[in-house]
Amino acid sequence: GIPICGETCFFGKCNTPKCTCNKPLCYKN
């Protein structure tokens, strides 16, 4: 739930491990 992945996502995938996509950012926990 914390946007600390430093990554944006638009297609439902995040490159950062253990990060999930919640447009427009990738979140971890």
UniProtKB/Swiss-Prot annotation:
PTM annotation: This is a cyclic peptide.
PROSITE patterns the UniProt entry points to: CYCLOTIDE
Record's keyword annotation contains Disulfide bond: yes
UniProt function note: Probably participates in a plant defense mechanism.
The organism of origin for this protein: Melicytus dentatus (Tree violet)
Family annotation (Pfam families): Cyclotide
Domain text: The presence of a 'disulfide through disulfide knot' structurally defines this protein as a knottin.
Crosslink feature (Cyclopeptide (Gly-Asn)) location: 1-29
Domain of life according to the entry: Eukaryota
Keywords for the protein's UniProt record, in alphabetical order: Disulfide bond, Plant defense
Disulfide feature: 5-19, 9-21, 14-26
Biological process terms in GO annotation: defense response
Family: Belongs to the cyclotide family.
UniProt protein name: Cyclotide mden-H
